[in-house]
Design a protein with these regions (language model features):
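Surface-exposed patches in mature extracellular/periplasmic domains of secreted proteins
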Residues: 42-44, 77-84, 150, 176-182
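A conditional alpha-helix N-cap/helix-loop micro-motif detector
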Residues: 128-132
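An aromatic/glycine/proline-enriched structural segment found at the starts
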Residues: 112, 145, 150-218
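A short acidic-Thr-Gly-centered motif at the start of a beta-strand
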Residues: 142
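M16 family metallopeptidases and their MPP-like homologs
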Residues: 1-18, 22-73, 86-94, 100-127, ...
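A generic secondary-structure signal for well-formed alpha-helical elements
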Residues: 20-21, 72-76, 93, 161, ...
Length: 219
């Protein structure tokens, strides 16, 4: 829903991913538990898809599966952890907003994507609307089961080792009955037609930047 979008702006979603632990384990505890292991697993929520992906060394493969399972079944939503990251954004946001390159990026995306509400610009108003409760509600709805999920595993994996891990950690996920509906209205499309726009910004060191974007439909 449109009102949920501020909570999934790239920087805010990154705050959740970077500050959240798993299950009963805070991020700091989880990091200590994973010390010495080469493994990384995390969720992704986009405009039209959601997923969990990761990577590991062969010896840490089961740890990767365990993290995947917990990311699916027992995510962690801690307001204090989340606010730590939000406060960090608030501290640097004034400088970011005063950066001409940032201002230009905003204007450019407005033109490229025809003011699509799903193309968000980080600002004070958006931060005020973002909240962890929305992230948790949407997350739990999307990852409540594995209906429609596709599993892809590539790399240096011994099949005799892999098979029991898949059966244990993926086979035990709730199957569900129906995959999440695909909503084509959530797609972000480039504006059609020939558009020209000049953006003038105050700079200490003036410069010119030109962006040209050409698009075509695939046959």
């Amino acid at each position: 829903a449109t009102e949920d979008l501020p909570s999934f702006e790239d920087n805010i979603w990154a705050v959740y991913r970077q500050t959240a632990g798993l299950s009963k384990f805070p991020k700091t505890t989880l990091s200590k538990m994973l010390a010495g292991k080469m493994v990384n697993v995390g969720p992704s929520i986009g405009n039209t898809t959601h997923s969990i992906s990761g990577n590991s060394t062969p010896k840490d493969l089961e740890t990767a599966f365990q993290l995947m399972y917990l990311t699916f079944m027992d995510p962690r939503f801690d307001e204090n952890e989340f606010q730590t990251g939000i406060q960090q954004i608030k501290a640097v946001l004034p400088n970011i907003q005063n950066d001409p390159d940032f201002q230009y990026q905003i204007e450019k995306e407005k033109v490229f994507y025809n003011n699509n509400p799903r193309v968000l610009a980080l600002n004070d108003e958006l931060l005020a609307k973002a909240n962890l409760a929305t992230i948790e509600r949407v997350y739990r709805e999307l990852f409540k089961d594995a209906a429609g999920a596709e599993v892809t595993i590539v790399g240096n994996v011994d099949l005799s080792t892999l098979k029991p891990l898949v059966e244990k950690y993926i086979g035990s996920l709730p199957k569900g009955k129906k995959a999440t509906d695909f909503n084509k209205d959530n797609c972000i499309s480039v504006a059609e037609g020939q558009i020209e726009k000049t953006v003038s910004l105050k700079m200490q060191t003036p410069k010119s930047t030109v962006h040209q974007l050409y698009t075509a439909k695939l046959p």
